[in-house]
Amino acid sequence: MSVGTGGEYWKDKGLPSVFKHELLKRYLPQFGGMTGSHSQDGRVVYLDGYAGEGRYENGDAASAEIALRVSSHFRAKRGLTLECFFTEPQQKSFEKLNRVVEHYRAGGVPAHAHRGEVDGVLDGVIQKAVGAPLFLFLDPCGLVLPQDRLVGVLAQQRPQKKPATELLMNFSMMAVWRLGGHVRSPKGNEKSLQRFDDVCGGTWWREYFAEAAAPGARDGAAEDAIEAVAAEYARRLARRTGMFVQSVPVSHAPHKRAVYRLVFATRSPYGLWVFGDSVARARDAWWQTLELQEEQNDPDALFSTVSILRPDPEVVAKEAVPAMAANLEQLLRAGRAVKLVDHTLELFGAYYGQVTEPAARNAVKYLHGEGKTSTTGVGGAKTRALIVHPARP
């Protein structure tokens, strides 16, 4: 069960929410467009399982209104239907959410708000999504649904590639830290530990913190255990569902540990490609917002934190191109043509989620300039659809 959010949360967006909502705003329209154009009646289903109030007090759109705006745009401009379902257990938050939803419903947007926990409506939404693509957005302030429940949805109820099913969820690093303390303490709360066992799909996570609490454990072992648990959670979800799973850290400030990770799951190589591009663009918005906040808080400062700590995007992109070209060269050594979108992670390597799509085309051009591919990278299909051939003998 999510613990909910207090009133301070809804005044305006914190930096983690800036990243999360920018990512959702960029990716959801592309998911809807990619899958809806091939679905029955052009219909896509979206579930926001922890919708909160839907809108911040300063008027900024939260996750619910972001989805409603996408749905409104699809209806007006693209002839697609994004049917939205929202759940929120807290009465006051639900009342505000419902007002936002009703405003869009009055304009013809197919949207439904339910007061209660997401687990109580999940199966009903899945039934509504039969024959249609489904996107699940689960963003609790606390613990997410048990992994067995998620696996049941992704691997049993929705195991097929088409219509597509995708998941974007918040895996709380703060909750892992708090519950890891129960493992390390002789007075730990066993009920809380069992609840997190359910979230993780087993007791395996406890071992990481038991090792961190052992005599002679090095400094920082507990902090590293949090990261290890998050990484293993994503690996297990991928193995149990057969999906591509990526885990993106989200923090309050540069060089700080993540407060949560956004875990993304898809069966589509196109989804994996577009998500990486969306992450890179959301990361840029995060830095821009931080810089704006610093300017507002201290307009007379000579230097901002951003100017000192932010990696120059142009430098990162410039460094990425030869590294990605080398990755592509390695793929071509098999002697067969390579369709870029089918090798997203191999192509981008460490730069996945760090650089945007144009870096991939530039890598093709770079490799062509070295005489290692006959494909020029100029013109033609969308970058993701480029087919790159080995150099002619």
What are these regions (language model features)?
Residues M1-L340, F348-P393:
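Class I S-adenosyl-L-methionine-dependent methyltransferase catalytic core
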